[in-house]
Amino acid sequence: AVKSDRVYGLLTHPTAPCLPAVLAVAEYKKSSSGKDFLLAYNLGIEVETKIAEAISPRHYQQGFHATGTCGVYASATAASKLADFPIEKILTCLSIAGSQAAGLRENFGTMTKPFHAGKAAEAGINALELTELGWTASANILEAPRGFFQAHGGSYEPDSILNVLGNPWTFNNPGVSIKPHPSGSLTHPAMTALSDLIN
């Protein structure tokens, strides 16, 4: 699979789960404006990246793939925002999505790795539909003793989320970029140097 996600200085690839979810809801809703679309997309990216920054480094060290685990929150946030949910329903949607958070680094280098992002996108849409059907879920899926942060890393850094959502917007700082090569970012300097030598 070509890995063409946009990421720079982040701990996850937020576009991969977020954009498909926003596109699906926009196609279904049809009354959304471009401004609504961009706001939902940016909110999804913001939530995913801040959660990825807040979770303990053990999350990654223990084998979790943040694009799959944190990405469910991007797709659920973006989808529920574009669906114009009130805050209570957004929280329910996030909680339902959180119960679907998955992705293991053991599958890096296989065809299953990009599947993580696709399942994270799907999780947000499933959560949206279940919320619309009246499903209930915890209002504290992230910080509860048996919630996401404890289950997936053992702890979290509240300062990475509280009072920093949208301040600054991740889309602006550190920003997003298009990968110059369809591979992991650690290989990019060598690939760029090799391309320069060939050219």
Task: Specify the residue positions occupied by each region the protein language model found.
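Flexible glycine-/small-residue-enriched beta->alpha junction loops
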Residues: 43, 47-70, 92, 96-100
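Hydrophobic alpha-helical hairpins/lids featuring a short glycine-rich hinge
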Residues: 1-53, 58
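Functionally critical mobile loop/hinge segments
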Residues: 66-68, 72, 77-199
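Active-site nucleophile and cofactor-binding loops and adjacent substrate-binding regions
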Residues: 10-16, 36-41, 59-72, 112-117, ...
